[in-house]
């Protein structure tokens, strides 16, 4: 790796990141959609294939998770307007937000209450389908609810699934795998919240805890799975299937925008703000949105000031060859879902030509935003899920991107969507603690 001093000279923004200051970065490598898609390792066909597979599984999902009955076994979340929160942001940050503000409530996705219910559940279902098809227990024309049988569960019990996680991915993989009958092990990093470990154990999942961070948990999980031919490892750092499971969100969002009569075209730009850990969730969603809206959607990743792994990887072009610890950042944050020191090289390289930019936000800010959203809209998210909330303020304040893309005149007709990545599963006492922290920090700031 280039010497750190050389990197700092080449990329002066690194100095601010090292000082744990909030930064806003416009991606100089973004290309027009038609150019970017030519070199992409994934295509629209891949996303459609994932969408079809989820439809095949819908009857099974509706049967085993009654909370999805109303949506016919499709795991989806509400898209809501948050005008009171918008007013509050404008007042607190003394910055007008041009365009409408909405929240995509993946925090309230059924089954596991976070964005990870998309990719995590999809990858487990795909693996189960492959095994069942090979075994002759299933054809693609069948009603997949037949998988809810003792015979199928006994068959899946001869296989195991493993994953490394800071929490939310572990929840979705663990809950789904256990429901199908797999033996499942979740390797949890030091920052994983206790309640997430307890919940998994209550579902019969084997949880292994590490003193080290996320990358170590993944590495250990991978090593143990390699030693067991019947074990399937869900690789959050490199998985195309996870990525495609997230990408399916885009066509669902498109329908919701149409229902709300919100237009997205050249005159009506769409801005989407996505909390980013290792990169799979935000990368997949942003990729899916780009396929649909091309140059009319502008996606920004949001990371904690203590864990800006994707930003450092993208800015230096080193991707997974650099970790935040290499430049003296500690990767210790209360935004547990985003506490990742080394980004996914696959996601970074795939998204580099599509992504508009990236910014960082402090833990203190996340807590204040958590309290504010609860007060104004009565919606409770976990700290990491608030990373996107400050995005519209930053984009409007640091207007270099808007000028460069000639968007200033169009902003009034634009739409901002903050991706609320998790929160509905948080126990009440834990959420009260988060709220109180936000309250104390708000008083301090004033």
Curated annotation (Swiss-Prot):
Positions carrying N6-(pyridoxal phosphate)lysine: 116
Reactions it catalyzes: D-serine = pyruvate + NH4(+)
Biological process, per Gene Ontology: D-serine catabolic process; isoleucine biosynthetic process
Cofactor: pyridoxal 5'-phosphate
Domain of life the protein comes from: Bacteria
GO molecular function: D-serine ammonia-lyase activity; hydro-lyase activity; pyridoxal phosphate binding
Enzyme Commission number, as recorded: 4.3.1.18
Any matching Pfam family: PALP
Record keywords: Lyase, Pyridoxal phosphate
Entries under HAMAP family matching the protein: D_Ser_dehydrat
Family: Belongs to the serine/threonine dehydratase family. DsdA subfamily.
NCBIfam families on file: D_Ser_am_lyase, PRK02991.1
Protein name: Probable D-serine dehydratase
Annotated source species: Bacillus anthracis
Gene designation per UniProt: dsdA
